């Protein structure tokens, strides 16, 4: 074993890349570390593609091992299971910048497996994993047009910070990940606190500039490893056949793309393709149908892009900067806590907001530590939304990714738990889709939260931008359709308020996207966003003054922390009885803050009254109404407040002599008692006869013996 090691400084971090020791049967493998966070990445590529396969089967698996943090997994089996949401999102983060760097004709299966094997709680594994993946692909010999770099950018005290620690991120107004090659940005994923377009663009440029250190280091690493390149060349395109396909289909496809209704257009395009394939096969039976259909797809892309570059109206008849027709409705579901129906052209989202208590918060236990999430956003993309049948089950990677993007867009305007002590769950059901459903979810979420009475800081809208670039000519498109996303060169999603950007996601399929093009896209997106916000504000300009009658109302009270044990009771008996008998949910914090959630005001008031009673201090000399809890030979134990009991001695039951306690008292009987004394051990001495004397002094005086 001859290890090859490359060490370099990346901002404040030391990065080490190593190969040649582990997984030597894989196509390539790299162990990478960044300040005690280590990840092992393997790459395996198949030497031959499956015959007839028309897609690139790239799979990225990212897995966090609990041993990396010195932990043992929970659960019965005590081993890692299916990928968590965080692992799925990181896998997508790795996949997005590397996928466009493989040749479009390359169809061999490639699998990337990244395993986190050691973790420093201050250094998130995602950046070093992206760097390690880039290094592994660079030394694999695969036809990969990399390497790529990766950088996380923070914004603290109006200064950009490279790869901030997790502690620094808590103070940052920006969490932006940018990845690209030496000359081009390929991918951006970010969450921001209403920052300007200029600041966001500067952050992207800053991150791309800083990661050049990584790209140079990987190039040096790959040169030292010196793996021979694969003997792979792209298949030769049959130019004569391509011309025949274009001759038969180009004009018809151009006409079909003037049909503005999606399903009618799809039917016509499908019919044209079938006709052309049948015609060519009739002329020559030796032709390959799959090859013909591939050529038709390429022609379709060329036709649509050519129309856009030439300045013709877009597929649905719009100009380049027009937003589709909007329809905004709130309160569409009677029993949900908040709801909205947001429609933009042929994209529609039914969004609901549900309020719960802090007990409903999601506990996220990862190798980076445990945390609670009080804002949940789930995105569902059923097959019927695109007029198809399909499997319905657990969320796919795309649904998890789109839900996270929508959540990023809203997070900056959500109130803190102190301001609004609820757990909020939003569900976006995509009921129709023709592009930009994640941004429709952002708009629908903002509306549903306002309908639910959640005091968000401002309305949020999202817009998806596209790009078609041919040579030096380019057109930036606002509010792209699904076809424009598929046939274009860039998917650029921006969410924000009137004041600034809250989320930015960018996936670029080609090189040569300049800073100027990104600036145009951001400014065009700003105009579209403000237009959508104005329509949304006409429907509901601010949050409702009150929450839904069906939502739990949370009442907060404070008790002395010494009294917490009294409210909980032995083995939780007191608080369990309180919740069951009042129909409320009660949460107690360590500082004595009690939150009572109830859908009915009377139930909450009763719970508050009983807690106040339980936590009240017993006062010497005060008369209480108590209940006989136990009878003994020398007296009776009577509850004074809640679970607090005191002793009424047999001599304090009545003015006359009492021979037998049970002759005067019964279990459960309510009696008036006066507190005579509380000793050092907290024992309470009570008197029934003193209570009677205090309440009826004249009568008692008459009954006193005369001397």
Swiss-Prot record:
The keyword Lipoprotein does not apply. GO terms for molecular function: 3'-5'-RNA exonuclease activity; magnesium ion binding; polyribonucleotide nucleotidyltransferase activity; RNA binding. Its EC number is 2.7.7.8. Pfam families: KH_1, PNPase, RNase_PH, RNase_PH_C, S1. It catalyses: RNA(n+1) + phosphate = RNA(n) + a ribonucleoside 5'-diphosphate. Residues 552-611 form the KH domain. This is Polyribonucleotide nucleotidyltransferase. It comes from Photobacterium profundum (strain SS9). The lineage of its organism: Bacteria, Pseudomonadati, Pseudomonadota, Gammaproteobacteria, Vibrionales. The gene is pnp.
């Amino acid at each position: 074993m001859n290890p090859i090691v490359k060490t370099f400084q990346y901002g404040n971090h030391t990065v080490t890349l190593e190969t040649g020791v582990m997984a030597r049967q894989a196509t390539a493998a790299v162990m990478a570390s960044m300040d005690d966070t280590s990840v092992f990445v393997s790459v395996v590529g198949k030497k031959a593609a499956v015959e007839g396969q028309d897609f690139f089967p790239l799979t990225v698996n990212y897995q966090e091992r609990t041993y990396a943090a010195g932990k043992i997994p929970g659960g019965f089996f005590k081993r890692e299971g299916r990928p968590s949401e965080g692992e799925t999102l990181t896998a997508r983060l790795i996949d997005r910048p590397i996928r466009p760097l493989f040749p479009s004709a390359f169809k061999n299966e490639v699998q990337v497996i990244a395993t986190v094997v050691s973790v420093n709680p201050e250094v998130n594994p995602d950046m070093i994993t992206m760097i390690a993946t880039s290094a592994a692909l660079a030394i694999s010999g695969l036809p990969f047009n990399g390497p790529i770099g990766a950088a996380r950018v923070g914004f603290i005290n109006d200064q950009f910070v490279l790869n901030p620690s997790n502690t620094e991120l808590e103070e940052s107004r920006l969490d932006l990940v940018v990845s690209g090659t030496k000359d081009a940005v390929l991918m951006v994923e970010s969450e921001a606190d209403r920052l300007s377009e200029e600041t966001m663009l500067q952050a992207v440029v800053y991150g791309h500039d800083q990661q050049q250190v990584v790209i140079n280091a990987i190039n040096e690493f790959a040169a030292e490893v010196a793996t021979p390149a694969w003997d792979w060349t792209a298949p030769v395109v049959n130019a004569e056949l391509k011309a025949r396909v274009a001759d038969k289909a180009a004009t018809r496809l151009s006409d079909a793309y003037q049909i503005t209704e999606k399903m009618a257009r799809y039917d016509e395009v499908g019919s044209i393709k079938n006709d052309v394939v049948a015609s060519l096969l009739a002329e020559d039976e030796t032709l390959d149908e799959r090859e013909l259909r591939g050529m038709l797809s390429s022609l379709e892309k060329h036709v649509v892009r050519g129309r856009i570059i030439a300045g013709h109206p877009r597929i649905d008849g719009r100009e380049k900067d027009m937003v589709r027709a909007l329809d905004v409705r709130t309160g569409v579901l009677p029993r949900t806590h908040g709801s909205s129906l947001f429609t933009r052209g042929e994209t529609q989202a039914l969004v609901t907001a549900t309020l719960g208590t802090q007990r409903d918060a999601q506990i996220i236990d990862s190798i980076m530590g445990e945390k609670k999430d009080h804002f949940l956003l789930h995105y569902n993309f059923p097959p019927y939304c695109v007029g198809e049948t399909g499997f319905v089950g657990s969320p796919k990677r795309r649904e998890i990714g789109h839900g996270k993007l929508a959540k990023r867009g809203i997070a900056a305007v959500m109130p803190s738990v102190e301001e609004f002590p609820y757990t909020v769950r939003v569900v976006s059901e995509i009921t129709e889709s023709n592009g930009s459903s994640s941004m429709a979810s952002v708009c629908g979420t903002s509306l549903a939260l306002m309908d639910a009475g959640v005091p968000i800081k401002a309305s949020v809208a999202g817009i998806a931008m596209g790009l078609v670039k041919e040579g030096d000519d380019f057109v930036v498109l606002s509010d792209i359709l699904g076809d424009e996303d598929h046939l274009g060169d860039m998917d650029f999603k921006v969410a924000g308020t009137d004041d600034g950007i809250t989320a930015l996601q960018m996936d670029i399929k080609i090189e040569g996207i300049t800073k100027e093009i990104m600036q145009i896209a951001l400014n065009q997106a700003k105009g579209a966003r403000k237009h959508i916000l104005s329509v949304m504000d006409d429907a509901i300009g601010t949050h409702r003054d009150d929450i839904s009658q069906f939502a739990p109302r949370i009442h907060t009270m404070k008790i002395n922390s010494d009294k917490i044990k009294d409210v909980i009771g032995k083995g939780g008996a007191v608080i369990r009885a309180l919740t069951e008998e009042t129909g409320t949910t009660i949460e107690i914090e360590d500082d004595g803050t009690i939150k009572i959630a109830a859908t009915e005001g009377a139930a909450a008031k009763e719970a508050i009254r009983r807690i106040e009673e339980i936590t009240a201090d017993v006062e010497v000399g005060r008369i209480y109404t108590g209940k006989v809890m136990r009878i003994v030979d020398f007296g009776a134990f009577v509850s004074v407040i809640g679970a607090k009991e005191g002793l009424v001695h047999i001599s304090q039951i009545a003015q006359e002599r009492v021979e037998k306690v049970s002759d005067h008292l019964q279990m459960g009987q309510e009696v008036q008692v006066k507190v005579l004394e509380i000793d050092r051990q907290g024992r309470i001495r009570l008197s029934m006869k003193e209570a009677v004397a205090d309440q009826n002094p004249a009568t008692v005086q008459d009954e006193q013996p005369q001397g």
